[in-house]
Amino acid sequence: MAGSTLRFSLLLAAAFAGRATALWPWPQYIQTSELRYTIFPQSFQFQYHLSSAAQVGCSVLDEAFQRYRDLLFGSVAFRFPHPIEKRHTSEKNSLVVLVVTPGCDQFPSLGSVENYTLTINDEQSLLLSETVWGALRGLETFSQLIWRSPEGTFYVNKTDIEDFPRFPHRGLLLDTSRHYLPLASILDTLDVMAYNKFNVFHWHLVDDSSFPYESFTFPELTKKGSYNPATHIYTAQDVKEVIEYARLRGIRVLAEFDTPGHTLSWGPGVPGLLTPCYSGSHPSGTFGPVNPALNNTYEFMSTFFLEISTVFPDFYLHLGGDEVDFTCWKSNPDIQAFMKKKGFGDDFKKLESFYIQTLLDIVSAYGKGYVVWQEVFDNKVKVRPDTIIQVWREEIPVKYVKELALVTRAGFRALLSAPWYLNHITYGPDWKEIYLVEPLAFEGSPEQKALVIGGEACMWGEYVDSTNLVPRLWPRAGAVAERLWSNKMVSNLDFAFKRLAHFRCELLRRGVQAQPLSVGYCDMEFEQT
């Protein structure tokens, strides 16, 4: 979108204060006016255009229509059978949705088109999109345009919007290993992700602390690796529910099973998988990363990731590869002998690379792509050209802007997470620092910058569980959402604060216990139900 068009849209926003300019994230182009139309909840409908490729029976939109009707009006239509203000001709009793391309039963993907246009004027109320995924984004925007007068009447202003995401991958990571998050917490998070136009749920399922994923191929992993196999696990049905719940909101589920490090919870369920650590010439009784010297290790990984590849439908799996501590490998005589046999000398990065390359070959054979943490790139592991590198370190070994330059110069696609670790909290409006991050602020060619496909906000679970997850996430994660959706030029903090504060109040109205941005109040304060 041209800079002049964007400036025009911002000038309009300043000229017409009100609900129509309180959108989050901000669209690529918006033109609005003070002309408003009345909406009567008891008669309002979402309708399919006669020419739409999606019609009644489209699960994604049928459910979205009901969901947004409930969000907008709840039981208002039944409590107020007649509006307080007098009925007149300037009313809107429907939003007509026209989807160009069929695809109601598919899963969203990295290449999904999310563009939409929204036109509300005297002649029509029309949401036009190429796909159902774009229609979902447009429905969220429409829901934020509707406002209610003090007398109780609903309105929507005359508006034209053309919108599309700046980046195709806009993710949120949840860590369900260090603290187990109940299924309801995950589903609630997916709801709020959709309100913010996030489209990737990065599910960091397992880690050193616990293994809550219920494996049907290796049930002992869960029985012996979870905090409590009766209560603190995600069953096969739970996982299916998360995947489908996310799909209906246009959200991909990117499952992460991090190896060879971060795997202590795997050990009890798979004897021999982890490396025995030594103290001198004797085992110390402790264990380190996955043992890369045994054929049994790769036989296990082959079978396990065959299961994972069938359970999770997304093309990509996240294979981790970060923070591998070599201390245990160095102490183990069998590992030392294997290194000598392979000609690795004392370079344990070569051993790590051997393991990861073998694992990547296994996963590739199942027709999957993969995302890895930046250490895989830093340690010069040979990976496929279509590998996605997730940059998470802020300053070590280099600052993240330099890392992005290095990754893209090598021709790899990149995701940025380094400045967006939301589990790191400070007193005051830390959302501003989050908001002002510019993902492409590194030295590189246009071709390099095109390889940055987006980023993720991360909520690691050392000090986060279901008691504090929601207020720690929201509305702070929204700052990341807008940075990944909106035009680069949308960066004014005053403009952002007014809209984000309004959006936070809207989240409260929707039942989300989002924390305040500063001093102030909302017309509808949060009430625990």
Curated annotation (Swiss-Prot):
Residues at the active site: 323 (proton donor)
Regulation: Addition of GM2A stimulates the hydrolysis of sulfated glycosphingolipid SM2 and the ganglioside GM2.
Keyword Iron: no
GO biological process, one term: hyaluronan catabolic process
Signal peptide: 1-22
PANTHER family assigned: BETA-HEXOSAMINIDASE (PTHR22600), BETA-HEXOSAMINIDASE SUBUNIT ALPHA (PTHR22600:SF39)
Pfam families: Glyco_hydro_20, Glycohydro_20b2
Molecular function, one GO term: beta-N-acetylhexosaminidase activity
Removed propeptide positions: 23-88
Key word Cell inner membrane present: no
InterPro entries on file: Beta_hexosaminidase_sua/sub, Glyco_hydro_20_cat, Glycoside_hydrolase_SF, Hex-like_dom2, HEX_eukaryotic_N
Primary location recorded for the protein, binned into one broad class: other
Species of origin: Bos taurus (Bovine)
CDD domains for the chain: GH20_HexA_HexB-like
Residue pairs linked by disulfide bridges in the UniProt entry: 58-104, 277-328, 505-522
Compartment annotation: Lysosome
Protein name: Beta-hexosaminidase subunit alpha
GO CC annotation: azurophil granule; beta-N-acetylhexosaminidase complex; cytosol; lysosome; membrane
Region of interest called Critical for hydrolysis GM2 gangliosides, as start-end residue ranges on this chain: 423-424
Family indicated by similarity: Belongs to the glycosyl hydrolase 20 family.
Reaction catalysis annotation: Hydrolysis of terminal non-reducing N-acetyl-D-hexosamine residues in N-acetyl-beta-D-hexosaminides; N-acetyl-beta-D-galactosaminyl-(1->4)-beta-D-3-sulfogalactosyl-(1->4)-beta-D-glucosyl-(1<->1')-ceramide + H2O = a beta-D-3-sulfogalactosyl-(1->4)-beta-D-glucosyl-(1<->1')-ceramide + N-acetyl-beta-D-galactosamine; a ganglioside GM2 (d18:1(4E)) + H2O = a ganglioside GM3 (d18:1(4E)) + N-acetyl-beta-D-galactosamine; a ganglioside GM2 + H2O = a ganglioside GM3 + N-acetyl-beta-D-galactosamine
Keywords of the record: Disulfide bond, Glycoprotein, Glycosidase, Hydrolase, Lipid metabolism, Lysosome, Signal, Zymogen
Known role: Hydrolyzes the non-reducing end N-acetyl-D-hexosamine and/or sulfated N-acetyl-D-hexosamine of glycoconjugates, such as the oligosaccharide moieties from proteins and neutral glycolipids, or from certain mucopolysaccharides. The isozyme S is as active as the isozyme A on the anionic bis-sulfated glycans, the chondroitin-6-sulfate trisaccharide (C6S-3), and the dermatan sulfate pentasaccharide, and the sulfated glycosphingolipid SM2. The isozyme B does not hydrolyze each of these substrates, however hydrolyzes efficiently neutral oligosaccharide.
Record note on quaternary structure: There are 3 beta-hexosaminidase isozymes: isozyme A (hexosaminidase A) is a heterodimer composed of one subunit alpha and one subunit beta (chain A and B); isozyme B (hexosaminidase B) is a homodimer of two beta subunits (two chains A and B); isozyme S (hexosaminidase S) is a homodimer of two alpha subunits. The composition of the dimer (isozyme A versus isozyme S) has a significant effect on the substrate specificity of the alpha subunit active site.
EC number: 3.2.1.52
Glycosylation, residue list: 115, 157, 295
